[in-house]
Amino acid sequence: MTSTDVQVALTFDFDGYSTWIGSHRATSPSMLSRGEFDPIGARRILRVLEQAAIPATFFVPGHSALAFPPVVCAFRDGGHEIGHHGWVHENPVLLTREEERSVLLRGLEALDKVAGVRPSGYRSPAWDNSPSTVELLLEFGFEYESSMMGNDHEPYWCRIGDAWSTSEEFRFGLPVDLVEMPVAWHLDDFPQFEFLATDKGYLPGGRAPSTVLEIWKAEFDFLYQRIGSGVMVVTMHPQIMGRGHRLLMLEEFIRHVASHERAGFTTCQDYVRQWRKGRSPSLPADAGDNRLTR
């Protein structure tokens, strides 16, 4: 992280086939072929990042790393961060604790085998954590995770033991030594652009890049002008953002950020390590008194 006050973390989920196999249960080569575009989109994005001389974070499922090893090595060789993104894009909420532990281990083994990296960061497939996720991430030595939305432009400490029901007041769990790099659906390209048919209906996608660019630029401008410091985490997928008209939008967004004197780009890891200095796990400032005690 540089000395600039406002940072943008460009993050890319290199899902490959895994999202269509693990999350969407692909039964046809046509659906699966969407993931085959991921390496093409990723190579294009890498060229954009290289030309702009900016770092990024790539969250990679183990399945995708083994399917497309040269691309994952290109992330590493380009000086970018590689994060953990499950094994085959499975939702942790649907797993037992032991199954989730196995998924974390299998993903780590794949990333080590392909690129020789041990990620410090994790992003849950589908942005959905189980009651066991935070404890397991601590067990495996992760420094941060990036799947929750309890803030917008400020990291915060993850917790263990939050409790809620319709009949009782919310109870805050124990803050632990795991940092959350918050995300947001309006800063994710998937719901904006991807067409998806499910048994529950359609995700229409297909929005004009100009509309999404307007949202992202406005979010950045609010951070820069009104808050004055912090981080904006943008989530993209090479198989989506790597399409020509959207890649032009990404280039325009990068130019917009770069035109501001106090702004720069960061990896999630770099921002988290800087943010941690002088801080220790704590609850949100506005948390009530109903709290879990040891």
Model-derived segments and spans:
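Active-site beta->alpha N-cap acidic-glycine motif
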Residues: 2-81, 256
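C-terminal domain-boundary segment and adjacent tail
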Residues: 2-3, 51-52, 206-294
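Short, well-ordered coil/turn segments that N-cap beta-strands
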Residues: 4-8, 52-56, 78-81, 115-120, ...
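Conserved, mostly hydrophobic/aromatic
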Residues: 13, 49, 82-85, 122, ...
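Acidic-and-aromatic substrate-binding clefts and catalytic sites of carbohydrate-active enzymes
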Residues: 34-39, 57-69, 90-100, 123-132, ...
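Generic structural signal for well-ordered alpha-helices
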Residues: 42-46, 69-73, 101-108, 134, ...
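Long, hydrophobic, well-ordered secondary-structure blocks that form the structural core
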Residues: 66, 79-138
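Active-site-adjacent pocket scaffolds in enzyme catalytic domains
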Residues: 112-113, 117-228, 284
